[in-house]
Amino acid sequence: MNVLDIAQNSVAAGARLTRISLTFDRAAGLPTLCVADDGKGMSPELAARVTDPFCTSRKSRKVGLGLPFLKMAAELTGGALALESAEGVGTTVTATFGLGHIDLAPVGDMASTIAGLMQCNPDRDFVYTLTVDGESFCADSREMKEILGGEVSMADPQVALFVRQYIDENSAPLLNKGESAL
């Protein structure tokens, strides 16, 4: 799953807060990825075309592949992509996947992804929530910044290392529980 690319869309849209949630409901068999932001949002016209790889709001290149790839990854597993956006309010992208499907791509290294987002965008806030069968873990950069007290930046490599380890340590018990680990 290309979570980093989707989250960077939020940053590029001026989001001050981006929420990334990954939910595994084994009984329903539907992993869900949701990225929601308070960025500038999209017009209804752009929102309707944004999953076209040749539709982009950028001027630097004429293609945008993050959302089209996420949509394709979801649909290959029997899932779907939903996008809600309002100008001046923000955007929410939700992708569902078929858990047991052979084409389900690995989630990837979410701890490094979230730590990297926090480190490279220290002036923005990110909330990462992992939920597995109703049990959740949340990493919130606002709480981390409060603990750091402004004396140490989220851009500090040692902070990024801590964030990655913190997410890994708290995610592992959720991801490895039960009869079939994710």
Describe each region flagged by the PLM.
Residues 42-53:
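Short conserved segment of the HATPase_c
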Residues 89-91:
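Glycine-rich GHKL/ HATPase_c ATP-binding element in histidine kinases
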Residues 69-79:
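Conserved glycine-/histidine-rich ATP-lid loop and adjacent helix of the Bergerat-fold HATPase_c
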Residues 1-22, 73:
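Conserved ATP-binding N-box helix of the HATPase_c
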Residues 94-95:
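HATPase_c (GHKL) ATP-binding subdomain of two-component histidine kinases
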Residues 83-87:
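A short beta-strand-to-loop motif within the catalytic HATPase_c
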Residues 23-33:
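Short beta-strand-loop-beta element adjacent to the nucleotide/active-site pocket used for signaling
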Residues 37:
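Acidic ATP/Mg2+-coordinating residue in the GHKL
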